[in-house]
A protein has these predicted regions:
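Active-site pocket-lining/capping segments in soluble small-molecule metabolic enzymes
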Residues: 1-67, 85-89, 94-186, 193-207
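Conserved nucleotide-cofactor-binding alpha/beta core module
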Residues: 70-71
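As written
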Residues: 80-81
Length: 207
């Protein structure tokens, strides 16, 4: 806050019952008492509980909620969410329609970073491949690794085509005016597993 920045607390993961009952509120309260601006959530139960204990706290619906249209976003608005982070898979036309249908809800959309080959947080590959659950916010990004692809006993890809599961990264700079015109309120730049220098530089380019 002293640097003129807003503080958003990430609770955008699926929580177990014992975590919700015994840890959630005590975890959030110190941040709230120091002026926390918003909490980013995935779990609907978590969202409702936060609104109960901190009724004036802004709630941002995480991309982990997989909101791909207006109906779900309207429900989230009715439940008290002020902002929705859209799925990366949404088109500009769909985002514009969301803005039209939910004009009071802030829309945040990804503009730069990795593209998951699944819907965000709807993947078990990291659990199987790296022992870390993407559904619990600990994705090891095994889809970004190099793989050999076989058809029966014959390898069918070479070293120049070894990233079989890695989607091309997103860079929305060329269409930034269109994104803003569609009604996007906040631009989201992926920071997971990135260092501060990278995040600062990319942010400065978009600013």
């Amino acid at each position: 806050h002293r640097a003129g920045c807003r503080i958003y607390l990430t609770v955008n993961t699926l929580l177990k019952h014992k975590e919700i009952e015994g840890q959630l509120i005590s975890y959030i309260r110190p941040f709230y008492e120091h002026g926390l601006d918003a909490v980013i959530v995935q779990d609907l139960g978590v969202m409702r509980l936060i609104k109960k204990h901190f009724p004036d706290m802004d709630i941002h619906a995480s991309t982990q909620m997989t909101q791909t249209g207006s109906l779900g976003s309207k429900l989230l608005w009715d439940m008290g969410a002020e902002r929705v982070v859209t799925s990366r898979e949404m088109t500009l036309t769909e985002i514009a329609q969301l803005h039209k249908d939910c004009p009071d809800m802030e829309i945040e959309s990804f503009v730069h970073g990795a593209m998951c080959y699944c819907y965000s947080g709807q993947c078990l590959m990291s659990s199987f491949r790296g022992g870390r659950s993407g559904n619990r916010g600990r994705c090891a990004q095994p889809c970004r690794l190099s793989y050999k692809v076989y058809d029966n006993d014959s390898q069918i890809n070479d070293k120049d085509n070894s990233f079989a599961l890695s989607s091309k990264d997103m860079c929305a700079l060329p269409i930034l005016p269109d994104i803003i015109e569609a009604g996007v309120y906040s631009l989201k730049i992926e920071g997971r597993m990135k260092n501060v220098t990278y995040a600062a530089y990319v942010t400065s380019v978009y600013r």
